[in-house]
Amino acid sequence: MIIMEEAKKLIIELFSELAKIHGLNKSVGAVYAILYLSDKPLTISDIMEELKISKGNVSMSLKKLEELGFVRKVWIKGERKNYYEAVDGFSSIKDIAKRKHDLIAKTYEDLKKLEEKCNEEEKEFIKQKIKGIERMKKISEKILEALNDLDN
């Protein structure tokens, strides 16, 4: 059982640090980790008890995780409380990567259209920015390809 507790602690630390890297509060990662580790849906109280953090912190973390598509509310017959469970992390990561790629691709296309309309003085500036966005677009395409390959 000691090994399981140590593994659980490592997973919570992993998701907390990943959240931090992405500009989120570490508690967002910890809440996801608890749900990821659980074999059944949990209530806010369950998560509070497990992580020893406030109700407000858990609620805000769950809201953010729901927005990102990493967590969903589940209904349990005969229960009045809200229950939450982790969504498959890989699908969520793919979805986020796709949304980022779509945003980059749209901006790239919009800049290309602007380039056609600008004068010579503006053209050099726009070209430089397009080159940078194009690199981002190529990288995001490769990331999506890799994620799709892993999923097959």
From Swiss-Prot:
GO molecular function annotations of the record: DNA binding; DNA-binding transcription factor activity
DNA-binding region per Swiss-Prot/TrEMBL record: 44-68
A Pfam family the protein falls into: HTH_5
UniProt domain HTH arsR-type: residue ranges: 7-106
InterPro entries per record: ArsR-like_HTH, HTH-GbsR_regulator, HTH_ArsR_DNA-bd_dom, MJ1563, WH-like_DNA-bd_sf, WH_DNA-bd_sf
Gene3D superfamilies attached to this UniProt entry: Helix hairpin bin, Winged helix-like DNA-binding domain superfamily/Winged helix DNA-binding domain
Keyword check for Repeat: no
Record's keyword annotation contains Ubl conjugation: no
CDD domains attached to this UniProt entry: HTH_ARSR
SUPFAM superfamilies cross-referenced by the UniProt entry: Winged helix' DNA-binding domain (SSF46785)
Top-rank taxon, per record: Archaea
Keywords linked to the UniProt accession: DNA-binding, Transcription, Transcription regulation
Family from the record: Belongs to the GbsR family.
Protein name: Putative HTH-type transcriptional regulator MJ1563
